Each structure stands twice: as C-alpha cells, then as structure tokens.
Regions:
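Catalytic-core segments of class I nucleotidyltransferases/pyrophosphorylases
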Residues: 101-102, 109, 115-122, 135-137, ...
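Conserved N-terminal catalytic core of the sugar/cofactor nucleotidyltransferase
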Residues: 2-5, 27-105, 114-116, 176-180
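N-terminal nucleotide-binding beta1-loop-alpha1 segment
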Residues: 1-19
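A short hydrophobic beta-strand segment most commonly corresponding to one strand
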Residues: 298-312
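Short acidic-glycine-tyrosine-enriched beta hairpin
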Residues: 276-297
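Glycine- and acidic-residue-biased ligand/ion/polar-headgroup-sensing regions
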Residues: 263-280
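A short, conserved acidic/glycine-rich loop-to-beta-strand motif
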Residues: 124-134
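A short glycine-rich, His/Asp/Glu-containing loop-to-beta-strand
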Residues: 233-264
C-alpha cells in the first residue's frame, strides 16, 4: 500500500494565507501543517512511500519534505496547470500501479482510526472504500409540533453522509481512472462509475473531521489544536493548569492502549466510549463513568474513548 495526497488546489478562499504557500501547507498550530498531520497518519500506518499530487506552489511542499523524511520516501507529481483530480490520479497510475492506494484530499484533518479503516477496506468486497462523515447543518434547527415550537438544536448532525476525502483504492480499481469521461474530477467521474457497478463501499466513524476550506474552518481547527499533541494512539490536550490543579483531555482510538501517569489523587471522567481500565483493579468503563485514582492507570478501549484526568 502506498499513500497519496491531492494537494493541488489554489485555496482561493484562504487568501492571503495561500498567496505564498499551497493550502496543504497552512499551519494548524506552530510549525505543524495540514500536510504534517496527514503524513503523521501515514507514518503510523507503516506506509513508506507517499506520492504528493501537487500543482499551485507545489515546489514549497518539496522544499519542506525533500525526497525522504522520517523513513518515508516522497515522490512529487506536479501539474504546471490545473487539469483536475482525474488527471492527477492518471499521473499517479503512470508512476505506480502495483499497489493499493490510500488517497487523501490535502485539506482535511481527522482523528479517524486509519488502522481500522484499512483493515475494513482491504478485507471488503469493494474495489474502493470511502470514509464518510455525517453532514452538519449550517443552521440551527427548530423542531415543531404544528405551530408550537418544541425544541431548538444548534447546528446538529443531519441524517445524511458526506464524502470525507479519504479513500482506499485497490489496485484492481485503478482501471476505472483510465476510462473516458466528460468531466475532469474523480468525484463526478470515477466514483459514480464505481458506485453504479456496486463496487464502492463506505466506512463511517464518529470522530473529529474537518475540511479546511475557509477562515472559519481554519479558526476551528486551530482552536482544537491549542495545547494539543498528537500521538499514534490519539491525542493529549492540556485543558487547564493552575498550581497543582491540572486537567488533561485524552482521546484513545479503539484497539489501542494507553498508560497514564498521575502525580497524586485524581479524578477520571469518561466522556465517550467504553473499554477496560486497569488501576487498583480491572473493570469495565463506559460513557459518563467517573472514577477516583491515586496511582498510574491504563486503558484498553473497545471503542474510541475520550476522557479527562483532573489531578489535585
């Protein structure tokens, strides 16, 4: 399996930030770009070869990563003028057609469990699998019963799914990209073709996902990354610190494990997920559980787990 990133967009709605760098090179925290995060995900999967499908200011990407970094070999396929994502994929196939491809749009950040995504996709009967996420309403929702207002919901998730910009494409499916189409983007050509042949699958996971397409999106992801550090198992974020009082927020992906050090009496609050916790004794945990601990503990999540630790 190889990794590939579609990073050729102009990022017009993010000007002037994209006047001198491509959108994928925008920082989501100090010295940590969108592309850094995506490559971090690839590295944690053990991917050794990554192809960057670039265009506008693509040389800036090559300057940052070079031919090899942190055990990953980079290949750059740069278009001098934008020809669409279909042509970008055709260029990739000319370079490599011997492996399955984990393809990403270069403007998304997600905490999805890539290991589970790859396991699901590679073992499925589908030629291509797409990560999907729930569509969020851009407006607040008013629930009515006749002419009576029953409740308000502020920008809830809707019962619709959208393309989240992460795709597992088996090498057998690469033939679809060589067919003749009347459009130049894979979303309006290859994907509908594969779906029509019932060879397209979907993978859903309820986790952070954000497409960074506007200043508002960028503000949201930068807020998320305040005091946050990513790890192969998830992330840790310092929420509060005053004297000896410290609160940390943790996110651990399912089928991972994490040992947590505490310096004294602490309270663990599970805000999502379920699994096993090992402290003075082994027991199951689930959402909304609150536990007191006085020594180091570890978790083995059965589901993606979010929890806070308040130390006194």
């Amino acid at each position: 399996m190889i990794g590939a990133i579609l990073a050729g967009g102009f990022g017009k709605r993010l000007k002037p930030l994209t006047d001198e760098i491509p959108k994928a090179m925008i920082q989501i925290k100090e010295n940590y770009t969108i592309l850094d995060r995506q490559i971090f995900d690839f590295r944690n999967l053990g991917i050794k070869d990554v192809i960057i499908l670039s265009g506008y200011l693509g040389e800036k990407i090559e300057e940052r990563y070079g031919k090899e970094m942190n055990g990953i070999k980079f290949t750059y396929l740069k278009e001098d003028k934008p020809l669409g994502t279909l042509e970008s994929m055709r260029n990739l196939i000319k370079e490599r057609s011997d492996s399955d491809v984990l393809l990403r749009n270069g403007d998304t950040v997600t905490d999805m469990n890539f290991k589970k995504f790859v396991e699901f996709s590679s073992g499925s009967p589908y030629d291509m699998t797409m990560f999907v996420t729930r569509m969020k309403s851009p407006f607040g929702i008013v629930d009515l019963l006749g002419d009576q207002i029953m409740s308000f919901r502020e920008k809830p998730n809707l019962n619709h799914f959208i393309n989240a910009g992460v795709y597992y494409i088996k090498k057998e499916a690469l033939r679809y990209f060589s067919m003749e189409y009347f459009s130049k983007d894979i979303e309006t050509t290859v994907f509908p073709k594969v779906a029509a042949e019932r060879k397209a699958g979907a993978y859903f996971e309820d986790t952070l996902w954000l497409g960074i397409d506007s200043e508002k999106d960028l503000e949201q992801i930068r807020k998320e990354y305040v005091n946050r550090t990513d790890f192969p198992w998830g992330f840790k974020k310092r929420v509060f610190s005053s004297g000896e009082r410290i609160m940390d927020d943790f996110y651990v992906r399912s089928e991972q494990s994490l040992s947590v050090e505490v310096t004294g009496p602490s309270v663990v609050r599970i805000t999502g997920g379920r699994g096993k916790i090992f402290s003075s004794e082994e027991k199951m945990y689930s959402e909304n559980d609150v536990m007191s601990v006085t020594s180091n503990f570890s978790l083995s999540p059965l589901e993606n787990t979010r929890f806070t630790v308040m130390s006194f």
